[in-house]
Amino acid sequence: MRTFLKLIKINIMKRIRLPIVFTLLLALFIACNNANNSSNSEDLGTNLTLPIIKETKGLKQLYVNNEPFLIIGAELLNSSASCIEHMKDIWAHIRSLNVNTVFLPISWQQFEPEEGTFDFSLIDNHIKSAYENKLKLVILWFGSWKNGESHYTPDWVKIDMERFPRMLFKDRKISNTISNINRNCLNADLKAYKKLLERIVQVDKHGTVLMMQIENEVGLLGSTRDFSPEATKLFEQHVPGELIKYISNNLNKLKPNIYKRYVYNGSKTKGTWEEVFGKSPNTDEIFMAWNYAKYINELAKAGKAIYNLPTYVNAWDASGGNLIPGVWPSGGPNYLMLDIWQAGAPDIDILANDNYSPTFGLSAANFVHNKNPLLIPEACAIWMNDTLSAASKAFFCFGHFKAIGFSPFGIDHHIYHSNHPIKKAYEVLDNLRPLITKAQVEDKINGFMEGDNASPASFQLGDFIFKPGYDLQKNSLIKGYGLIIQISEDEFIVSGNACHVGYESADSSKPNSQLLSVEEGKFVNGKWVKKRTINGDEFGIKLPPNPYNIASDVYLDDISILKIKLFKY
């Protein structure tokens, strides 16, 4: 095609006797075609390649500019990005905390205030400001649904309930959630989302936007499913063959709740939802999850055709209420519904874990399923006084779960002040980022966190077994944490805070072990630079190296990087 167009261009120059009108029309055709090609190109204007999710040795990682990338992230409070002026002082503060990626919402209500009229001011300014502050962005599309309801839809969608119907509860009361099976709802959302992607292509010439989140914590609150006549009619029809085929082809990979519902009901190849999965609230949620997944997959597929960015959905996770859907948004991509979402939304790259759980590690582990990489875009419930756990959870996620990214919610809240421990923790994680991503693929890393049942009491790296310990005199607010990376047969990088690590040989032929050396330092341009040699009273795998009295808050951010060498005999 390009050769053909080049010949046309040459022909135009040679045939100067062609009628002027015809010449202008050809030139216009060439210009339009070039514009179309560039809008869908991987050339971002600076020869940068698009971010991708790449699988290596069975592990999926985010690649940015052809290099593995860790999202050392932070999400804004919901309303902050609604105003350019409000964000002016926030950008620099976020950067000062050593964040590399901001999770930033764009509201459909503001983006398309009147049908067919789009306001690009917010997305334009946010991309520009992020780039100027050397930050990457993950754009959160608050479209049809946010936290199980539809408060971010434009007024013209909310008002016209005939055109954009709501879901109904079992008692036939009208919900605040627009339908996930209505084509008008989907088409309107789809049109706006595509417009957003088209705009990002036009203005993001530096690869600032890394990923797209479609909707936010979808599902129906207050009911197991939509009981509208339209939804009930669909519920009484046969389960789509596409879903049954996926389930039967992946039986050994399914979560227990899906496996049991399908197999214990006879592994049917056709039938209604209740015939195939049995009559239960869980079946209602399977039905809802399928419809949400199909709806959102259409947005993902259309968006990628415009600008092929990695795309994910996030989950308000299933917990409480004796596991009855509707206590959490029924049908969302929670850990019980991961299989249904993977079947119904193949164009979604990640099913992400919004993790405010008191059993943090268990919730995270539930999402490491069938090659779904762990991404935690929201964590640390500041409304429940969880104000200091971001550092420990970040280390734990990257080390133990080989996460793609971690982000506390509400980074612009005053609790994340300039001396918050996340600042030093993120500085250290950024310093170790190349080692972490390499070790994740090679399975030469592990992480740990005090007080979490999913945290390993011991683990093996190479020929050595490590045992984290937390029995230090310290402020009760400080929870110990860390990660260990194997960099050679007998050398390891250890980093974290408020803990110590025991070690022993895992080699039965050489059952004894000894710590030969400990250095404190950091990496500069990929090379280890020693700050000091640790010995005497400070000798050992101690974080920090001199924990005489860490009752003071000053030690909240006393995060060291140690290089240790072990010997077995």
Regions found by a protein language model. Name each.
Residues S38-N100:
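N-terminal carbohydrate-binding accessory modules
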